[in-house]
Amino acid sequence: MKKTLILAAAAALVSSTAFAQTPRAVDVKDIVELELLTHSEVTQKIKEGKTSVLLVTGGTEERGPHNVLGGHTIMSRHRAVEIAKRLGNALVAPILPIAVAATGVSEGTNTPGGLQVPADVFKGVQLAMIESISYSGFKDIYVMGDHGGGQAQIQEAVKEMDAKLSPKGVHVYYINDFYQKTHDDVDMYMYEHKLPIAGHGAMMETSEMLYEEPVPGMYVRPIYKTVPFNPTGQTPEQWKAARDARAARQAAMAAGNAPPAAAGGGRGQRGQDPNAPPRVDNGLTGDPRPSTKEIGKVVFEIGVNNTIAEIKKQTAQRRGSQD
């Protein structure tokens, strides 16, 4: 009798566990990714008011020994989905996983796996994506990229396609804050919290992917806590001075004045840190070791909020100019 009761209890436990693990059925109302919708579902969503679409470029390149190659694409997808959901009237086109000037792409590279296309080809792809998605019935197309390479071509393509499509009632926008302002704001957050600033595959990207990965180790390997890295070649104070100088130049130019002389350093222009350790050349620049999911959430929110703010600002300006 006792054995029978034990077996019955075990069977009940297995049954309840299996039931608890049964995945929840997909609710199409929650889906904003075009690639996960049928064409009839897209038609219905547009009728319901989702007349905006996000066209986002990610990228495939080395990000150090600890981060997966598709980091730009992964982060772009997570941010874009959240942006669309918060906007409430937008869908997300498939993320383009190839950009211009990917890091580590050269003959005989010791950091394999990267993909890139020439600038003119990339611009042509942007033009084609914008035009083809305009056929679907979207009224506002927001174009952006998470990779520095290709920003100029995205901007050029947006300008050309907006001029072509605006007479048809379709407007195209270049959302630079998805990339540039987000990097600047994240760098400032790191500076204010005395964390490592900037780099490639370092604090910003590692923390954000730790926050986004569905299971530990999928996007960021555990070795990030001990991995050797190349220094950025810049102290925090050198970074701050370069940032302030760049802001002063931008303000002067916006006011129509002659900009002050450029200072050394800044993102992409490194002042020299005389105490920097020797290079290890493993594809990683900057220190990722203090990265956490909590910092990643901050980075994620900065990117999402900056993008939403610029989308709303540009859309309001366009609507106002039409009144």
Mark where each language-model region is.
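Bacterial N-terminal signal peptides that target proteins for export
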Residues: 1-7
